[in-house]
Amino acid sequence: MTDVSAAAGGATAEPPTATMSPTSVEPLTNGAKKSAMATTTETQTAAAAAAATTTPAATTTVTVTAAATTEASTSNQVKLARVENVLGSTSTSSPANETKPKSLPDGGNASVAPASSSSNSISTQTLIQSQSQPHAKTNKSTTVASQQDVDEVARLFEEKPEAFEKWLTERAPPEALSRLHEFIESRKPPKRPSVTSDLFQQWMASSPTVQQKSPGRSLSNSSASSLPECRRHLMDLDEGELFMELIRDVANELDIDVLCHKILVNVGLLTHADRGSLFLAKGTANNKYLVAKLFDVTQKTALKDAVTRASTEEIIIPFGIGIAGMVAQTKQMINIKEAYKDARFNCEIDLKTGYKTNAILCMPICNYEGDIIGVAQIINKTNGCMEFDEHDVEIFRRYLTFCGIGIQNAQLFEMSVQEYRRNQILLNLARSIFEEQNNLECLVTKIMTEARELLKCERCSVFLVDLDCCEASHLEKIIEKPNQLEQRPSRAIKSADSFEEKKLRNRFTVLFELGGEYQAANVSRPSISELSHSTLAQIAQFVATTGQTVNICDVNEWVREHNHQIRTESEIDSTQAILCMPIVNAQKTVIGVAQLINKANGVPFTESDASIFEAFAIFCGLGIHNTQMYENACKLMAKQKVALECLSYHATANQDQTEKLTQDVVAEAESYNLYSFTFTDFDLVDDDTCRAVLRMFMQCNLVSQFQIPYDVLCRWVLSVRKNYRPVKYHNWRHALNVAQTMFAMLKTGKMERFMTDLEILGLLVACLCHDLDHRGTNNAFQTKTESPLAILYTTSTMEHHHFDQCVMILNSEGNNIFQALSPEDYRSVMKTVESAILSTDLAMYFKKRNAFLELVENGEFDWQGEEKKDLLCGMMMTACDVSAIAKPWEVQHRVAKLVADEFFDQGDLEKLQLNTQPVAMMDRERKDELPKMQVGFIDVICLPLYRVLCDTFPWITPLYEGTLENRRNWQDLAEKVEMGLTWIDHDTIDKPVEEFAGCADEDIKDIEFTVQTLNCNQQSQETDAHTTPEHHRSGSRLSMKKTGALGKAVRSKLSKTLYNSMDGSKPKTSLKLLESHVSEDMDDKSPTSPSQPHGGSVGRMSASSSTSSAGTVVDKTKKRSKLCALL
């Protein structure tokens, strides 16, 4: 006989084959046979294996054939076989007395027949039983594993843990794994069935609207069938162990019903009491009472029965009434030996149940702060004693100390669960506010249903106040901003009058009533008579008037206190408690009243109920307010549609004008000078402007290309002209000039080669509509005044409005010039129009300019990409919008005055409405700075734009050249302003610029410059001539800047005269002007006497007449030195 362990431990060079003869195998005992039959394994074959032969009945041959070629693999195979042997994985023979080959982890194959050896064979069941029950006697027919086998298994696990794990997962028999699992579980400490550690997770996982109690498992765990075993186990413990075991039993219990039941059962075990009751403290600080959580619970009473009985027959005991009430009030224990002899004992319960109460032990349950949270009461001893002794009292007191902690924890847990459910309900209500915003009845019904279910009340009502919800007044209340400077008169009146006034104002118009669980909500509109005869309506009226929350425990008493009359006795008889709360909107205005009537258990509403109900009232107010706002918004939208229809009708040109324009003969483009960059509209009448627009459309071949009906085009042009306001600059003629410049750029400037026909159509439409309904004010003014346009459009305010007006005209009947376009072309052209109109905002120009300059600097010549085309169109729109700066000087000068007048009008509005100082270009008092500001505008915006366009597209050079010419004119005008020679002396900018007459052709020597020419000789008539120096007068009358320096032109002329006189040559200009300047300056430095003429030297003062007299005449040399310093 070859032993498996010996083969595993032997050192052989080749894989051995061990054959066990039938005579060398000991016969299996019946127990071993049964064990082997119970541990059959399914073998797996990886390759061809040696066939296993079996002998009849009681003989089994074990053949081990190794496929590995190394000693280590052979050893591992045998070790794994040893593991199988130790864990009982021997397989029984098949019905054909054959065994299937089994693959080992190391690659070997083994044919194993069910064999057992007295030295190394053991079943898994025997091993587990021997380890789990060390003191039990083993079966004589089983063999215990030797220490060597255990060491071999441990060594294999240490050397090959991965192989061991693989064997367990892949080849271990299910029976062995099951026994191993049972063995592991038996080594763990027993799990306490009373502690529901996963209770909170089950609460959270359950539906908050359906699951209201802890899972039913808590009730079934304490069933009567398991009590006898528990009781026998506890009876075997001594008193200390029993006490600690019962404390552990309630320590971690979170279900308040289960906890109270365990407390009463455990107290009965500790004190041998027959039955017990547990009361929990409820109510407010001024109205405390006890509620029987569980009543008359014995050790055999099931939890489910106890809870059902307590819920159906709720017992309420006020503090100070009865034995339990007295204990709760005094916090003192009461031990009664004979209950019927105590006056505080109520024998009615005994009479109902037939039970006789002898001894009573009643003790308070306090929390860690010493406040009463409950009262426990036990009745009658069961061990033959007639009373509870001091030992029972001490045990009862000590146990209730721990129970107080458990009860408070359970109550906190219950509060957290209730808060969780409350939050879930409020989230659902928040969703409902948006889901049901168009149906007030459904929304209020859903809120009332949730409130009724959560707060356990019989009925719920909502009264809605008759509010002034008309659209106009409602919007006025929202938009109206109180003026801080406005002082409103005091409206102090008597409180009684104020109450009556509010009462009349807060009249209910809608009543929502929700009854029992299966009753539908009732919506009614009660009359004034019905409201006056309803006590509930009177209470609601009181709450709506005062804005206070009312929690009524006794309706009759409240009615008497507030001097109300009880009109309906049946209504009062069915009402015990009312919780009434106002519903307010976002403006803190009472819009309704919510009522809860009667708690389901008959107790008053608590502060906790009021707190929860407040959240419902808030959500109800939000829902009602949101629904009313939604209804008002829908009405306003309907009104807006009607207004748009009216506006569209009045914005459309009338039929007579359309027919007249349709029949008119449109002249050629050359007659209107449309191809020229010097086009001007001053000579065109209004009808000619419309004909010029038609000619541009026809010259671009847009009418035939896009099949635009001619009458529709005429009507659209007239409608566009009609929708421009008669402001000074941003009017219809400005739109015509912008469109003509775009036409000239496309035709004369050859820009049409970069555009498609659809884009040309969009650009011309955008130019004509880019300032529709302009009000003569810019975007900044709209933002400052917070106009409706600024509220509607946050960026590019006026430009968005212009585009919307364009769309409105196109959508008007008979004005859609895009009607023949396909949907794709329509979207494309509308996108072009929108982008082009928005590009006229200079803020957009500055955003796009850098990107456009970068493309130009990189030598871009292909402008067909979408982004590049958008940049190009934006630059072209800006170039057309400011093209007046490139017109001939006569036209540019006149247009600039129109722009300035419009800007000055806006500045006046800012001073009047906003009480702010406008910027310089809009300040009428600084109109003399306009030429300088024009130069800045050209340098910052116009010249960079036209320069880059001219460099890229040389055919539009006239725009750049015209801008340069106008810049020179404005610069010259700005210099002359410094001399006081321009329009600043006029109230309006409508006179030509003052010039030096004949400066171009005549010799300067023939022109006599005087102080009067420089506006320095005019005397002030408004100030005291004796005390006011000349240099303190109006700056517009001086010839020098405020800094004392002369203008550039004046310095040039004066220096030329000075140099000619110094080198002895004949001066071309008289030095009278020089002497006047110097004399005036000298006079300014000395006080003016009454005898001297005001304003210094006046008249014709030559150089030869400057003789000294009485120290007042300055020498000619000194004058020239002073003049040089001045220059």
From Swiss-Prot:
Q: What sequence ranges are listed for the domain GAF? A: 255-407, 439-624
- S-farnesyl cysteine lipid attachment residues: 1124
**Which residues are the active-site ones?**
730
Record field: compositional bias (Low complexity): 1-19, 36-72, 116-133, 214-225, 1099-1114
Question: Where do Basic and acidic residues bias regions lie?
Answer: 1023-1033
Please list the residues that make up the propeptide: 1125-1127
Q: Which reaction does it catalyse?
A: 3',5'-cyclic GMP + H2O = GMP + H(+)
Glycoprotein recorded as keyword: no
| Gene Ontology terms: biological process | cGMP metabolic process; signal transduction
Description of how the protein assembles with itself and partners? Interacts with PrBP.
What family, per the record?
Belongs to the cyclic nucleotide phosphodiesterase family.
Name this polypeptide is given? cGMP-specific 3',5'-cyclic phosphodiesterase
Q: Which species? A: Drosophila willistoni (Fruit fly)
Q: Which gene encodes it?
A: Pde6
